[in-house]
């Protein structure tokens, strides 16, 4: 069954509009809230649900129902974030716009109420929007009867301001840590900052900063969730940086310096996570705000360092723009006036750094060095510096960059007076016009007080070097400043006491005699003598103080140093060898340094190469790790998406099952109600008031109905039986009494029936006569129309017959035409089929002929290939025969050489060498004797065989070959000669006992041929196989 009509969003929207039209806005909001938060809404289409949400947020704003709006918007985000993100942004923007509109209307209403008053800052006296009504305000409202502007704003504007603040916070909570909604999140955060700035909401700004900070912290904690933001993404990180910079600007505008410093820390944390460098315009804003924060916190050292970093950034941006490597959007626009101003502030802030620490603290005896070190490390990291700044380093950096030339004249003169040419007696006269110029500038006026501290420090340092005691009046006269910046004696004494408490000054004040006494103890610590070296000082360089002359304490303290120097010079004059040894050692060290410079340079280059390789390997490993991480993250994201899809499918199935079950329960309940109503209306006496409908079912109702019917039937039978007994007696009495009156009643009945019959008969006859007369008259009246009717019927019949004949002939013509057409189609079809069949047979025949022709061509090609192979084989046979003849000649020459060697061994004379005639017969392959060299008869027979014609080949069987050797060298021309003949032992059964030449080991029989035996021709020589055969294969073939 389809769902109930009220479940559809269109019906809910229509119902809510109807309720709004009759003035029932809360009821309409409840209807919309129930529909939005219902589980059935998840399956509704977003297109139809968006108008419902727009009306829902509008009612929530009108009725100031922030909690209901939060619940509905959370539910709507969960429904639409996987399908359509734009609709979430539309609804949330509408929500914020309506809340802002209500605040504007409330302000206009308050202005109308208090038109005579002007307000520069609405609701400025309300410190906390979440704690508006305090006991004081309630008492004031009770006692006071006048209507002030503050009370009007508190009653009219402040509730809507509170609702607008709740709106921003709700929207930020809904959009947090969602990568698909982070643009809307940033926009809402910027709007919330503007809200705090416009209405001067400092408390809400602190809560907003903490809320955003918690969101960023939770982003790393819940990074594995679906649609979680990734701070490694440059675009996401840039959006958060933009938000934090706006937060920093608003904090500075509201003068919330603690929140501004925490914003600085947030920005520094995000910058450390960023892979791309920040824009120069953003960093310029960063250093400018940081300098203002340090100035407010009276940390003049890091304030000057921030100004130095700011100036370096401006100079870098100017150089980048001049080189055309950057854009004006990414780099701050810098003019000569801006550069001069920045340089002046760099020098002025460096001059304002206290030489000694004069702030109120527990003194140098407390162990606070570790805390100060950690604090300085944090501030140094915020400035992006490698080491903590110092006063001397800042001045050195400024002088190296030539900032004095670009600074304003009064700042340049102030530097010369304080750091170059400081004279305690004329310092105040020289510096008075400069302080007046600085005090006239509102931005530089803040540096007058720290400059006074520096001047006093320099003054007492110089006085301590010249005087042992001075009068207080003299000191007061020296420390005279211009009129707006005068220093009272109390302030001077306070300065002295703080310096002495820190251990940076060693001064005693005698108010009775009015004298200032400087500590002249010879054995006093060097800390009191060298201001700025203490733990609480802002400066640790002793040389920064101008030394006019040494004090007695310094003379006593440096006595050993002077004595050591004097003795060293005396030794150099008394013992020249000592000086020469020092010079030789120095020269040897220089020689060693020069000799090892090249090697050290090579080692440095090699180390640099190794470092580069390690860097490349580390970079590759990092990139590989990043790729693997991205792959794992992508796989994890896919798994999460699949899990989310599976979860949504499971939820949808569960919702469908629940819907079907609810529908079945609803139908069953309706059926039960219907059956109960039928049971109540159909069966009397049944009571269902105490029966629970949840426990009922159809079977139980049927059983109850049957039981009640059985009960009613039994009661009816009892009543019938009782009534029957009673009626039997009455009926018997009634019938006995009737028997007396039946005859008279029968006669009266017959009489009444006869009278009634006669009346009905007369009436029937009269009606029949009247109808007959009317029919006769009608017949006479219509008889005149009979000829006309017959003619008309005849005409109609003839026309219809003609029409029938015409249609029948047309049908016959159509039938004949269609019959001919059908015959023609059949003939064409048969003709076409015959042609197709003949074409198929022709194609088949052509295909068979083509296959046959291809087979013939293939056979011809195969025959040609075989012929070519045969020719090539014949050529190879001829070449192999030639090679065999060459081998035989070589073999003959080897045998002759062997025979000559054998003859030399046995003592026979070597036959004379003669030119061999050209042989026409093949060389004989005669095996030598086994007992020794060839005999004379054998050599003569060989000569005759070589000189005569080749005899006929022998017809007898070849002799058995000697057993083949399993090892040793085998000539190439004999490796395949005897492969076909099996090995056999010698005919006489004895192994040869004499040396057998290699050429005759495997050829012929073991016994020498007979002197009368005809040698074999070359045709009987074993033919070479034409290719090399391995020895193991030869042995296997044997």
Swiss-Prot record:
GO terms for molecular function: mRNA binding; translation initiation factor activity. Residues 92-121, 611-899 form a coiled coil. It comes from the Eukaryota. Residues 339-523 form the PCI domain. Residues 621-641, 800-1038 are annotated as: Disordered. Its main location: cytoplasm. GO terms for biological process: formation of cytoplasmic translation initiation complex; translation reinitiation. Keywords: Coiled coil, Cytoplasm, Initiation factor, Protein biosynthesis, RNA-binding. Residues 1002-1019 have a biased composition (Polar residues). RNA-binding component of the eukaryotic translation initiation factor 3 (eIF-3) complex, which is involved in protein synthesis of a specialized repertoire of mRNAs and, together with other initiation factors, stimulates binding of mRNA and methionyl-tRNAi to the 40S ribosome. The eIF-3 complex specifically targets and initiates translation of a subset of mRNAs involved in cell proliferation. Component of the eukaryotic translation initiation factor 3 (eIF-3) complex. Belongs to the eIF-3 subunit A family. This is Eukaryotic translation initiation factor 3 subunit A. It comes from Aspergillus oryzae (strain ATCC 42149 / RIB 40) (Yellow koji mold).
């Amino acid at each position: 069954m389809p769902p109930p009509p009220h479940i559809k969003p269109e019906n809910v929207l229509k119902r809510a509009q109807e309720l709004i039209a009759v003035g029932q806005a809360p009821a309409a909001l409840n209807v919309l809230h129930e529909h939005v938060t219902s589980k059935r809404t998840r399956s509704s289409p977003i297109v139809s649900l968006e108008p419902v949400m727009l009306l829902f947020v509008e009612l929530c704003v009108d009725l100031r129902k922030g909690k209901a709006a939060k619940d509905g918007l959370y539910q709507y985000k969960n429904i639409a974030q996987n399908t359509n993100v734009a609709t979430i942004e539309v609804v949330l923007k509408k929500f914020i716009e309506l809340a802002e509109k209500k605040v504007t209307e409330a302000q206009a209403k308050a202005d109308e109420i208090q038109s005579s008053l002007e307000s520069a800052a609405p609701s400025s006296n309300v410190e906390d929007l979440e704690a508006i009504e305090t006991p004081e305000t309630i008492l004031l409202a009770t006692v006071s009867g006048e209507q002030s502007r503050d009370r009007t704003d508190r009653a009219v504007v402040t509730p809507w301001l509170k609702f607008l603040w709740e709106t921003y916070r709700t929207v930020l909570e809904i959009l947090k840590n969602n990568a698909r909604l982070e643009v809307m999140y940033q926009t809402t955060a910027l709007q919330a900052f503007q809200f705090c700035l416009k209405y001067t909401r400092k408390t809400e700004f602190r809560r907003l900063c903490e809320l955003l900070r918690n969101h960023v912290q939770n982003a790393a904690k819940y990074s594995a969730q679906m649609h979680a933001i990734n701070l490694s993404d440059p675009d996401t990180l840039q959006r958060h940086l933009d938000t934090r910079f706006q937060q920093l600007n608003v904090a500075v505008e509201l003068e919330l310096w603690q929140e501004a410093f925490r914003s600085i820390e947030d920005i520094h944390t995000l910058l450390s996570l960023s892979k791309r460098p920040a824009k120069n315009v953003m960093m310029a804003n960063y250093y400018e705000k940081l300098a203002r924060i340090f100035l407010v916190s009276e940390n003049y050292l890091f304030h000057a360092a921030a100004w130095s970093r700011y100036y370096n950034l401006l100079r870098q941006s100017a150089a980048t723009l001049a080189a055309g490597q950057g854009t004006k959007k990414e780099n701050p626009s810098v003019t000569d006036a801006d550069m001069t101003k920045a340089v002046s502030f760099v020098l002025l802030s460096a001059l304002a750094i206290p030489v000694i620490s004069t702030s109120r603290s527990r003194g140098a005896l407390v162990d606070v060095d570790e805390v100060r070190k950690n604090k300085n490390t944090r501030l140094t990291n915020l400035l992006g510096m490698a080491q903590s700044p110092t006063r001397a380093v800042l001045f050195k950096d400024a002088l190296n960059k030539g900032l004095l030339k670009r600074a304003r004249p009064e700042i340049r003169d102030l530097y010369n007076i304080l750091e170059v040419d400081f004279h305690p007696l004329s310092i105040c006269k020289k510096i008075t016009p400069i302080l007046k110029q600085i005090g006239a500038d509102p931005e530089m006026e803040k540096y007058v007080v720290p400059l006074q501290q520096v001047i006093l420090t320099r003054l007492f340092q110089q006085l301590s070097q010249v005087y042992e005691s001075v009068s207080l009046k003299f000191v007061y006269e020296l420390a005279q400043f211009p009129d707006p910046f005068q220093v009272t004696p109390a302030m001077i004494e306070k300065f002295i006491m703080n310096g002495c408490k820190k251990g940076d000054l060693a001064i005693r004040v005698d108010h009775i005699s009015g004298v200032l006494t400087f500590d002249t103890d010879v054995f006093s610590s060097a800390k009191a003598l060298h201001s700025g070296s203490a733990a609480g000082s802002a400066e640790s360089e002793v040389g920064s103080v101008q030394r006019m002359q040494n004090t007695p304490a310094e003379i006593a303290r440096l006595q050993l140093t002077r004595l050591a120097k004097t003795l060293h010079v005396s030794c150099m004059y008394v013992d020249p060898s000592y000086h020469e040894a020092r010079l030789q050692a120095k020269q040897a060290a220089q020689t060693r340094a020069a000799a090892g410079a090249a090697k050290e340079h090579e080692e440095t280059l090699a180390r640099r190469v190794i470092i580069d390789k390690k860097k490349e390997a580390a970079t590759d490993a990092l990139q590989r790790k990043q790729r693997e991480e991205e792959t794992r993250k992508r796989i994890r994201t896919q798994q999460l998406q699949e899990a989310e899809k599976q979860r949504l499918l499971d939820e949808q199935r569960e919702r469908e099952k629940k819907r079907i079950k609810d529908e079945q329960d609803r139908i069953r309940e309706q059926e039960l109600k219907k059956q109960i109503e039928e049971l109540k209306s159909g069966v009397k006496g049944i009571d269902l008031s105490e029966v629970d409908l949840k426990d009922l079912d159809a079977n139980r109702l049927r059983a109850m109905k049957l039981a009640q019917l059985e009960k009613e039937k039994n009661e009816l039978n009892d009543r019938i039986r009782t009534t029957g007994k009673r009626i039997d007696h009455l009926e018997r009495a009634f019938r006995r009494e009737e028997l007396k009156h039946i005859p008279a009643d029968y006669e009266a009945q017959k009489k009444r029936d006869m009278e009634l019959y006669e009346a009905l008969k007369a009436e029937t006859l009269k009606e029949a006569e009247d109808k007959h007369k009317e029919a006769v008259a009608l017949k006479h009246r219509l008889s005149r129309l009979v000829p006309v009717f017959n003619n008309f019927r005849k005409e109609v019949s003839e026309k219809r017959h003609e029409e029938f004949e015409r249609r029948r002939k047309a049908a016959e013509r159509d039938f004949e035409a269609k019959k001919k057409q059908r015959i023609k189609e059949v003939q064409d079809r048969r003709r076409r089929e015959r042609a197709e069949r003949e074409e198929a047979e022709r194609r088949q025949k052509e295909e068979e002929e083509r296959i046959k022709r291809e087979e013939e061509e293939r056979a011809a090609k195969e025959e040609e290939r075989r012929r070519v192979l045969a020719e090539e084989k014949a050529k190879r046979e001829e070449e192999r025969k030639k090679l065999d003849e060459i081998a035989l000649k070589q073999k003959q020459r080897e045998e002759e050489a062997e025979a000559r060697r054998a003859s030399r061994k046995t003592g026979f004379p070597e036959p004379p060498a003669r030119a061999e005639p050209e042989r026409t017969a093949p060389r004989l392959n005669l095996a030598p004797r086994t007992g020794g060299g060839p005999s004379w008869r054998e050599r003569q027979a060989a000569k005759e065989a070589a000189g005569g014609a080749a005899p006929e080949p022998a017809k007898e069987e070849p002799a058995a070959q000697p057993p083949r050797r399993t090892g040793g060298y085998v000539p190439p021309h004999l490796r395949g000669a005897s492969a076909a003949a099996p090995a056999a032992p010698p005919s006489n059964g004895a192994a040869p006992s004499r040396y057998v030449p290699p050429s005759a080991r495997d050829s012929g029989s073991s016994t020498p041929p007979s002197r009368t035996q005809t040698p074999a021709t070359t045709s009987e020589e074993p033919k070479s196989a034409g290719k090399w055969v391995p020895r193991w294969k030869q042995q296997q073939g044997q």
